[in-house]
Structure formats: C-alpha cells, structure tokens
Amino acid sequence: DLLESRGLGDVYKRQKITAFGSTRRANNAPEDDATLNTLLKSETKSIALFGKSWTLHALEVLRTSLEENVSLIEDSVAYIVSHGREVVYDAEHFFDGYKADRGYALETLMAAERGGARILVLCDTNGGTLPSEMGRIVEDVKAHIGTELGIHAHNDSGVGVANSLIAVELGAVQVQGTFNGYGERCGNANLCSIIPNLDLKMERTSIGREKVQQLMEFSLFLSEVANVYHDHRQPFVGESAFAHKGGAHIDGVMKVAHSFEHIHPEWVGNERRFLVSDQSGGATIVSKLRRFMPDIEKGDPLVGKVLE
C-alpha cells in the first residue's frame, strides 16, 4: 500500500519472493532437517540456500569434515529441488575460501551444481576482495562451472559496486545488493549505483530506463520507511550528486551540462542544484536570480551587487 501511494506499485509487482536459509546441519538427513523443511513450508517458488565455501568455516565454524560439508551442500540443494523449487545457492565466503584453497572452494560449487541449483552466487561476505582479484577469480570459476553465476558483494573495501559490475561484465546474471547500500558493517553493494550503471552505461537492462527514473524517489522512500538518514552524497540518488558549488563548474554546466556531469540528473529522478557560497561566481547568481528575473544576464549590475 505504501508503494502504491507513491506511484511505485509496479516495483513490488515485479519481485520474486524468495525464502532464505542455510544448508542442512552436519550429520543430519535432509528430510529430517528443520531448516530445510521450514523453507519448504514457506511455499515460495524460489529458495536461496547458503553454504560454506571456506575450509576455515567448514572446520572451525561448522566443526565438521571437509567431505561432510561438500555432501551437505549437494544433499540440501537436491532435496529442495526434488520438491519442485528453484534453488539459488549462495556460496558464502567464496572469495576468501578460493584464496585459501582454490580446489576446495570450486568443489563446493560443483556440489551445488550437481544438486541442481539454478544459479550459483559467489559471495564476498567479508568484503575484502579487490576488483583485480574479482575478475581473475570469476573467469576461473566460469572455466569450471556451467551453471549461471551471480554476485554478492559487501563494501568493506569500498569496492562493492565495482566488484558487482565486473562480475556482470564477465557473465553474472544475478546481482545481490541492497538499496541505499544498507547492510552489515560497511553495507552491501548499493543497488542505487548498480542499477543506473547497468541500464544507462553498460547497456544491460536491469529494470529498464523508464523505471530508473523513479530511482531517487524509491531511495528516499526506503530511507523514510527505515527511519535512516538519506546520504546526500550517494552517487546518482544523493541530493548532492548533481550539486555544483565552484564558480567555474557552474559556469561550465550552464553552457554544456555534461562538462561537469556524467549523466543527466533527470535520468535517475534527481535534479541539478547550484549552491551559493564564497566560491560562487556570476553564473551561480544568475541561475538563482532567473527564478524571479528570467531575462537577467551575467553582466547585469545586480549580479555584481550580489557578489559584493
């Protein structure tokens, strides 16, 4: 109802509700596992299962053998698939696991693939993977895995969006992220940046250009609902994303918009703003005065008086 009241009802209608939970417990049959059976009771068509990719987590967190961890991944996926559900397998800590033991991390993916997962999502759960590593690792995974891939990036190194876009360029068909980058620690990859980059710059349709025009409104709406301060410096949808302060910048934008803007603000539902400060020049003052005096020019004496 809230979305409908804002004219954003179509955003909800296009979603696929997905139940989310872990693989079965170690040394537990899938049919006897409470988590898996609860997921099935959700009656969602799609179920996301997460499992361990890192030897450290299998041995020290699950406290099971590496062999049992591989089995529980395959068994859990196969059990859900046998009930006619689509499985999205989230390979938790995949990149850390790959860097610690490449062969084992790939083996866990193959287990999920054998179980029948539709998509294998490579998760940078700790957010420590750099873009240079991302490309190399995804390419290697593609050489060994035939199932479609997804990406789940965290922003602990400040590169969650970059890593997500690299994965898409290399063939990932699903991007897991959050609007406004909400999430654990430093947040998840920000969909408010990923979506316009895909649709406007990379010629990859995520929600379509028409829907992208609602992006800022949706971002503000979510901030209100979450009761979280809206970051005005957010790329694309922040109030300062297209705000200009320096006199030379403003003069340039007024002459040729893209001289200091990478896209048109209205493409994402934002707007251009000129800020008045001690750095302002005549162009800034003219832009403000034209709201009341449409014909005023930079050489008008009034502009000089305001600057004084």
Where are these regions (language model features)?
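Short beta-strand/loop segments at the ligand-binding rim of alpha/beta enzyme cores
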Residues: 14-21, 83-90, 145-155
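Histidine/acidic-residue-rich catalytic or RNA/ligand-binding cores of hydrolases
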Residues: 134, 186-193
